[in-house]
Each structure stands twice: as structure tokens, then as C-alpha cells.
Amino acid sequence: MAFRIPFAQSFWQEYLSGQEANLPRLPEVEQVTETVMRILGGNPGRMQLQGTNTYLVGTGKFRILIDTGQGEASWIEALTKQLEANGLEISHVLLTHWHGDHTGGVPDLITYNPELSSRVYKNTPDLGQQAIHDGQKFHVEGATIRAVFTPGHAFDHMCFLLEEENALFTGDNVLGHGYSVVEDLGTYMTSLTRMADLNCALGYPAHGTRIEDLPAKMKEYIQHKESRMRQVLAALERSRARMTATGGGRRAGALTFPELINSMYGGIPDEIEQALTPFLSQVLWKLAEDRKVGFEGEPSQRRWFAVGPPAATAVRL
């Protein structure tokens, strides 16, 4: 079994802290379009930006709820206030993925309305939840939502396509500000391509403001990840070139995680190195899957090296 450094949100707090700066203020509740109402989860932070976006979707009495926030009292209060003031009911609860800032409000929902216990849908559902399948459709007045399986940020991640607006609820795969973190970069890149191929005009992210030009945002995300992969590969190729010049063999210039980080960024504090290591791990495994890098040694002392011709001179077949 391949060794990968486990995803740990605490390591990413430093990495994401810059995304907090200069974030636009979002109202607690906003009728974004005739069909979509956004209700903030009341959980702002480095990982959650202004807080988790939850969405009531539809134009009639019955609405579809996408995500449930983290379980903050302010969220369930804001949601139930909107339901009761407008005579609304929830027909389905759709969860984008398993992370607690998206599923944490489910118990409060069921306390508010026990009938909702049989209307909670998630890919790879927990006990008592209903399964979501790729391509499955959910209907209420004014809204037809199609589920799109897009793993990578999380193994069970789903996006939801709102047909009436040609809009995509992007979950945590694509954010309104900055970039997301991932569990599996190779799978995530495949999902980004699938999302881009849907050609949706607008994006409703799980964190941040509405994405007004989703095709441009998808292109930006894909290019950003590809750029990081090129940077890592270039660092390994530079190390190989230096060692080959002194008579090294096929695995010349192999580097450990700390050595690679030092090669790319120089001396950095330990906490920043910890923040970079999970992301770097995902990049290296993606490059290994693409057969651009190899590795040797036991997991705790694994060393990585470039294989094949340098990227700048590689022959395209």
C-alpha cells in the first residue's frame, strides 16, 4: 500500500491564514437570486473563510437545503427564522461531503423537524442517511438539481448542478477566495476537469462569494495546481542535474521532504514546513502516478527523484 502523509487540518491553518485577509463581508442571510438563498454557517475561520455557505434552493413552498454548517446555534436560528417567516419546508438535505463544517448542523435540523431524519442525502451515507448517486436528480418548484460525483478534496465529495441557472454548487472543490486543500491530488485534478467540462456559468461555493465566471475560475484552479507540480518537478530535476554532473546514477539528486522543501523555499520555520508537507506529498504522488518521479527507501525516510528527460526537453510521443 502506498504511504501518504495523512490529511490534517491543523497543519493547513498557517497555509490558509492569508486567505482571511481582506475577505469581503457576507450578510448572514442573502437572497442571492430568485432561486438561491445563502445562509452563513456562523463559523468564520482560516479554513472556513467567512463561514460555511448553506443554501436553500427553489421558488415554492418546498426547498432543497445544501449543507448544514458546523452546528452553530446562529445557523439553525437563522435558517428556521427564514423557513417560518416565509412558510417554507425542506424537502431534501444534500451534503457535499463528510467534513464537520458541512454536516455539523444535521442534528439541529432533525431536532427542529424529526421528519428530516429520512431526507438527508450524502454520497457514502452515514447510518440513517440516504445515498446520493452520480447523476441523481432532485426536484422542487423552480429548481432541478443534478448530483455530480467529484472526489479529491474528500473521497465522497459531490457537486450539485442547478439546471435552471446553469450554475454549479462547487462544495469545497472550488472556493470563492483562494484555493482548497485536497486528500488526493490526482483524483482532484480529474474532478476539476469534469467540473470544467460541465460548462456552468456560475458557481456557488461552500466558502466565499458567488463565482460570477466559473469557467475562468476552473481554468485558474487547474493552472494553479499544474504550476505547483511543475515547480516540484523542476526542483527535483535541478537536484538531479547537480548530482549527475558529479557522477551520480539514475537516482541522482534524490531528496527527502525536508530537503525538497529547503531546495524550493530555503530555510523556513518548522510550522510552515509542517503546513507544506501534506500538499507536497500529494504533488509527489501525482507526479509518481504520471511516472515523472520515482522514490526509494522506507516511508519515514522516503527520497524522491526525477525520472525521464528534463521537462523542458522531454520528447512528446
From Swiss-Prot:
User: In the UniProt record, does the keyword Cytoplasm occur?
Assistant: no
Q: Which UniProt keywords apply?
A: Hydrolase, Metal-binding, Zinc
Keyword RNA-binding in annotation? no
Q: Pfam families from the entry? A: Lactamase_B
The reaction(s) this protein catalyses = 3-(2,4-dioxopentyl)-2,3,6,8,9-pentahydroxy-1-oxo-1,2,3,4-tetrahydroanthracene-2-carboxyl-[ACP] = 2-acetyl-3,4a,8,10,11,12a-hexahydroxy-1,4,4a,5,12,12a-hexahydrotetracene-1,12-dione + holo-[ACP] + H(+)
The cofactors named for this UniProt entry are: Zn(2+)
Name a single GO biological process.
secondary metabolite biosynthetic process
InterPro entries linked to this entry: LACTB2-like_MBL-fold, Metallo-B-lactamas, RibonucZ/Hydroxyglut_hydro, Sec-metab_biosynth-thioest, WH-like_DNA-bd_sf
Quote the record's binding site residues for Zn(2+) 2. 101-102
In this protein, the active site sits at 101
Q: What class of enzyme is it?
A: hydrolase
Q: Which SMART domains match?
A: Lactamase_B (SM00849)
| Pathway the protein takes part in | Secondary metabolite biosynthesis
Membrane-spanning residues where?
A: none
Q: Give the protein's biological function.
A: Lactamase-like protein; part of the gene cluster that mediates the biosynthesis of the linear tetracyclic TAN-1612 neuropeptide Y receptor antagonist. The decaketide backbone of TAN-1612 is synthesized by the non-reducing polyketide synthase adaA via condensation of one acetyl-CoA starter unit with 9 malonyl-CoA units. The FAD-dependent monooxygenase adaC then performs hydroxylation at C2 while the polaketide chain is still attached to the NRPKS adaA.
Sequence similarity: Belongs to the metallo-beta-lactamase superfamily.
The protein's name in its UniProt record? Lactamase-like protein adaB
Q: What is the lineage of its organism?
A: Eukaryota, Fungi, Dikarya, Ascomycota, Pezizomycotina
Q: Which gene encodes it?
A: adaB
